[in-house]
Amino acid sequence: MLKEIKWKVNNLPKGDKENCIKFLNEEEITKVRNFHKSFPQYKETPLANLEGLAKKLGVAGVYVKDESYRFGLNAFKVLGGSYSMGRYLAQRLDTDISELGYDKLTSKEIKEKLGEITFFTATDGNHGRG
């Protein structure tokens, strides 16, 4: 049983948008979200409410994302791989990924344009790098 809870204070400046990583802007985040929402298997990740921990910490709530439901693969890592493949296919089709949802990507027309393509993904552990 957990006897001690440790935390690290985040001393990074708040609201310093100018120094954020540029590819993580609102427009790109929206593209990523919309791309994944176009998949029929997509479901929002449920949150587990850790009421006991919240009470012990004296806070209103503590929630943890349950990634075991992510596309039936038990991990969040699929998101980076699928989006990377989507962007590659968009590049091959000379279009923006925001124009390519699941239905279009899996259409006969797109399959004929792209031909046979094989993807391989791998990870180097629990770091989410593919």
Q: Which residue ranges define each predicted feature?
A:
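PLP-dependent amino-acid enzyme catalytic core
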Residues: 1-130
